[in-house]
Amino acid sequence: MSNHRDSGVTGKFASKVGSANNLVLRIVSAAVLGPLVLVVAYMGGWLFFLLCAAGAAGVLWEWTKLVADSADARILVPGFAALLFALVLTGVDEPEAAAAMIFIGSALAAGVMAAWPRRFPARNPLVWGSCGIVYAGIAYLGPALLRRDTAWGFVAVLFVALTVWATDIFAYAVGRVLGGPLLWPRVSPNKTWAGAVGGVVGGVAAGTSVAYASGVDKLVAVGVVALLLSVLTQAGDLFESAVKRRFGAKDAGSLIPGHGG
């Protein structure tokens, strides 16, 4: 009986240590990558478009390995090609054509997978794989199109980035420290209501701080936008957890230390 109790205590201690280490990795990742991203965002232009495209390519790579159980060329080739064309079209000031290219790449991937299905597929990635190209395309087009505004583009990118990062870090930290009722246990066994509220508070504080420092006077409106963005960030996190559960994966990727994708 004593050995059983000791092993349970040891397991809980190891879990807490692992959670603390994960939080440290998240903070370190943000501290290292954050300034780099913001410097490139401040510079803008082709360099920032390239950074966004590289990030979107990473998103597509991890998504494809998750939903197709491999680096499926039927998804990656048309997906990477669509991102490349979107990059060029954004750079020559054709955002509508860039967006259209993402959907063309998604449709092409679906057609290729329908025409050449795997004989014994472990999974059927047609819908999930083609939607992943749209998902990655949004990850590229969102920040790239925001930054095109020469007057407020950098502030907009800074607002979104800091709101999202603060939401993620505060939700994780507050949830781990306070615990409490789970937000949606069927989807995620770790996310709590306390963490969700903490994430919203942190996200709104970060977003309004950016606006205040940038001389924006409509702070109430900015706070509402930051609140909505924080909620959407956490909803996206829950969606990712649902996808991971759907495909039996613990993490969706490992490109950024401390983040499961």
Where in this protein do the model-derived segments appear?
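Membrane-embedded alpha-helical bundles of polytopic integral membrane proteins
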Residues: 2-228
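A short local structural element in Rossmann-fold oxidoreductases
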Residues: 170, 240, 244
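Re-entrant/interfacial helical elements at transmembrane boundaries that shape
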Residues: 176-177, 243-246
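Interfacial loop-to-transmembrane junctions
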Residues: 246-261
